[in-house]
């Protein structure tokens, strides 16, 4: 059963579990569980994805309840009219909030994009970032006896593929658990010492003006047990995830 965090006659939103694909893909033929099909069976009607979340990312994922709504609303979700808030645990400490304006080249998939042009220009990509908490753990990943990590609030202003993961890696503060853009030493430490074997990136909140009622919609999704036990270990108050809204 998926946790439904919002529903009206036009939309339904779930708290996507980490590791679950949004829909069937020929690249992952062995997979049997998908958010789209599970949700369809759960509510008894077809659903139409309005945006994407990478497979390892958890959090708010919104679907339209008809193809007509999907086609009308999709441009809004693709544009700047959505306010998205993510939380991530990253390597090292970032002391001040800021804005990263750093263009990203289109990431091509080795299989799916085999025949796509390799020469596409970089696309504008902007992310707002804000440090919320920090911790120093008594484990070494380098010449120092301890290692530092930080909790970040991230707000993408554009929607490029793997934007937050790539932007944090560009800042030399990769998201813990990122096997593509991250640092294997830190991923291993979290896997072995903190029982956190995956990407620590969560889509906490989505805000938009409802296109049919003109009311502001705020959809929030709680973090799962992996995050909760990390907050306990690091002595971070859970209110950090809602205080900045």
From Swiss-Prot:
Q: Which organism is it from?
A: Vibrio vulnificus (strain CMCP6)
One Pfam family of this chain: PseudoU_synth_2
Enzyme Commission number:
5.4.99.26
Q: Which reaction does it catalyse?
A: uridine(65) in tRNA = pseudouridine(65) in tRNA
| UniProt keyword annotation of Isomerase present | yes
InterPro entries in the record, alphabetically? PsdUridine_synth_cat_dom_sf, PsdUridine_synth_RluA-like_CS, PsdUridine_synth_RsuA/RluA, RluA_PseudoU_synthase
* UniProt keyword annotations, A-Z: Isomerase, tRNA processing
Tagged with keyword tRNA processing: yes
A GO MF annotation of the entry reads: tRNA pseudouridine(65) synthase activity
Its domain of life?
Answer: Bacteria
Q: What is this protein called?
A: tRNA pseudouridine synthase C
- The enzyme's main class, written as a single word, is isomerase
A single GO BP: enzyme-directed rRNA pseudouridine synthesis
**Entry's NCBIfam families?**
PRK11112.1
| Active site: residue positions | 54
Question: What does the sequence similarity comment in the record state about its family?
Answer: Belongs to the pseudouridine synthase RluA family.
Q: Coiled-coil ranges per the record?
A: none
């Amino acid at each position: 059963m998926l946790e439904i965090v919002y529903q009206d006659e036009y939309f339904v939103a779930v708290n996507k579990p980490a590791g679950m694909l949004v829909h069937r893909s020929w690249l992952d033929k062995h997979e049997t569980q998908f958010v789209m099909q599970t949700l369809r069976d759960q509510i008894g009607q077809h659903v139409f994805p309005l945006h994407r979340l990478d497979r390892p990312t958890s959090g708010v994922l919104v679907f339209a309840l008809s193809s007509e709504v999907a086609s009308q609303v999709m441009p809004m979700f693709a544009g700047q009219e959505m306010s998205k808030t993510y939380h991530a645990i990253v390597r090292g400490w970032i002391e001040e909030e800021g804005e990263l304006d750093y263009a990203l080249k289109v990431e091509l998939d080795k299989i799916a994009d085999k025949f796509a042009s390799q020469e596409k220009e970089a696309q504008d990509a902007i992310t707002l970032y804000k440090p919320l908490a920090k911790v120093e753990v008594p484990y070494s990943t380098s010449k120092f006896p301890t290692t530092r990590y930080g909790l970040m609030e991230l707000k993408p202003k554009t929607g490029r593929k793997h934007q937050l993961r790539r932007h944090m890696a560009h800042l030399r503060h990769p998201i813990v658990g990122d096997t593509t853009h991250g640092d294997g030493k830190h991923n291993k430490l979290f896997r072995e010492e903190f029982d956190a074997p995956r990407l620590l990136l969560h889509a906490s909140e989505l805000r938009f003006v409802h296109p049919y009622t003109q009311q502001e919609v705020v959809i929030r999704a709680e973090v799962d047990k992996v995050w909760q036990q990390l907050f306990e270990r690091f002595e971070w108050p859970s209110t950090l995830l809602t205080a900045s809204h």
